Amino acid sequence: MAEHIFTLEAEGDEHIWRQMNVHLHLYSYDAEGNACGVVSANNDTSHKSGKKLSVCTPKPTAEAAICLYVVPKGLPESDRVSDSPPLKLTLRVLRDGQVIDSMKRQVNQFGGDQLINVRYK
C-alpha cells in the first residue's frame, strides 16, 4: 500500500478565530490499520497563520483520520438565535499536496461543531 503525507487545513474569517476554540487532530495508520501517531493543532498555538490553521503528518503514512472540534469561547454577542448566524469554516484534506476533500462547515455559535474519525487513504 502506498504511503502519503496528509495535511488537514481549516480556514475561516476573523469571527471564527475570535469566538471559537478550533482543534484539529490528524491520526496516522500503517498499512495494517494500526495507529502509529497523532498530530494536533489549535488556534491558540503557533500553527495559526492569519485565517488558516493546518497540521500534517510528520512522515508518510498509509492512511489518515481527521477530527475537528470547534468549541465556543463564550456566548455569542446576542442571546437570540436569529442574531447569531452560523460561522463558516472550510476544511480541506490534502494528500501529497493535492486536495482530496473539501468541506464547508456551518458552525453553531452556541454549540460549536465536531467531525470525528473521517478516514482517507
Task: Tell where the protein language model's regions lie, with residue ranges.
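Mature extracytoplasmic domains of secretory-pathway proteins
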Residues: D30-S82
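Short beta-strand scaffold segments in enzyme catalytic cores
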Residues: L91-V93
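Exposed beta-strand face motif in extracellular beta-rich ectodomains
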Residues: H4, A64-I66, L87
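Beta-strand elements of well-folded, non-transmembrane domains
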Residues: G12-E14, P72-G74, R95-G97
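Intrinsic-disorder/low-complexity, polar/charged segments enriched in Ser/Thr/Lys/Arg/Asp/Glu/Gln
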Residues: E3-I5, G50-S54, L115
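C-terminal partner/receptor-binding element of secreted or periplasmic proteins
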Residues: D96-K121
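Short coil-to-beta strand junction motifs in C2/discoidin
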Residues: W17-H23, V81-L89
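Acidic/polar, low-complexity intrinsically disordered N-terminal segments immediately downstream
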Residues: M1-H47
